[in-house]
């Protein structure tokens, strides 16, 4: 039964980048917490959290995959030659890769489960294919006085550079925050000038502008409990990166329990979330990459959650993003158009 189900869920393999249809997942076995950037060479590069894929090759120090069309992805290599050494224990999680001043910056989290002082670091490469050279720590949780400081996200606005971050905690100072970076994007001049935009029940912040609004997409609940994972994505919007970000009901995301549902589990996939920036294709359609867990095959041999890479189209209705049925697509769908 499981084999039959898996065969139905394998991505369609047709003629190549000109395919007119695709089917989830678009990459497996794992590309968790994905980020995507388009290189000067015309390829899309996606990156994921450090993970052991269960293939005997050990833990990959931020896997890199690439594609011409967001559908057919090929493994490239690990982003790092050696692991960043500014922290004693932990993994390299939730990388965010962007082009800054002609270089490729990777803002990443350095953490382990239950870490009392995780932090955010920076690595830089000349090419999106790496290798990325570590620049060290930007800040840790104690420095910035925000518990569980992970999941960084980079944003430029009005000529200024910012990093946003945050994850789950019930402590009063918890939440999703932003702070201005230096002009070169390599440091934080004043951590005391951080500003809060969302409550402590969000993580995996992604902010992107469309029209007059900035849209906040964040993930809630459990990311990594195999087929029982309850991760899901909620959205709010604001006319300013400083907020307030309000959901469809007008509630501020700085209040717990808010956010308009964008994406949640279905009978086949659990825990869809931690999306990348959406990508606009040549037809003007927006596409969202994220990870999810196939309930019928939720883990690899090492015990890691089998968080596969997923792709779905964003539609817009009255100024709000939607995904069909607010769940991962299962059937063949029209593919992104790239000429």
Language-model-detected regions and their locations in the chain:
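Sec-dependent N-terminal signal peptides
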Residues: 2-13
């Amino acid at each position: 039964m499981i084999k039959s189900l898996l065969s139905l869920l394998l991505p369609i393999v047709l003629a190549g980048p000109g395919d007119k249809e695709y089917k989830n997942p678009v990459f497996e076995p794992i590309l968790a917490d994905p980020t995507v950037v388009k290189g000067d060479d015309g390829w899309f590069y996606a990156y994921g959290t450090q993970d052991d894929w269960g293939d005997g090759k050990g833990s990959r120090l931020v896997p890199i995959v690439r594609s011409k069309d967001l559908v057919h992805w090929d493994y490239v290599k690990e982003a790092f030659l050696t692991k960043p050494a500014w922290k004693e224990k932990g993994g390299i999680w939730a990388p965010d890769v962007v082009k800054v001043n002609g270089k490729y910056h990777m803002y990443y989290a350095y953490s382990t489960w239950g870490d009392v002082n995780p932090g955010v670091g920076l690595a830089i490469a000349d090419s999106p294919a790496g290798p990325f050279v570590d620049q060290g720590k930007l800040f840790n949780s104690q420095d910035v006085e925000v518990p569980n400081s992970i999941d960084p996200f980079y944003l430029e606005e009005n000529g200024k550079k910012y990093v946003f971050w945050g994850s789950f905690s019930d402590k009063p100072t918890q939440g999703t925050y932003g702070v201005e970076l230096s002009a070169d994007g390599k440091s934080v001049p004043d951590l005391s000038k951080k500003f809060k935009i969302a409550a402590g029940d969000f993580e995996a912040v992604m902010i992107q502008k469309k029209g007059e609004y900035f849209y906040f997409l964040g993930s809630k609940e459990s990311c990594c409990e195999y087929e029982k994972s309850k991760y899901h994505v909620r959205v709010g919007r604001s006319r300013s990166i400083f907020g307030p970000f309000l959901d469809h009901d007008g509630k501020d995301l700085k209040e717990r329990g808010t956010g308009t549902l964008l994406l949640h589990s279905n009978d086949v996939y659990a825990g869809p979330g931690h999306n990348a920036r959406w990508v606009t294709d040549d037809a003007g359609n927006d596409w969202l990459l994220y990870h999810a867990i196939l309930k019928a095959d939720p883990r690899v041999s090492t015990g890691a959650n089998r968080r596969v890479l997923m792709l779905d189209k964003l539609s817009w209705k009255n100024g709000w993003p939607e995904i069909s049925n607010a769940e991962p697509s299962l059937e063949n769908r029209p593919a992104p158009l790239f000429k």
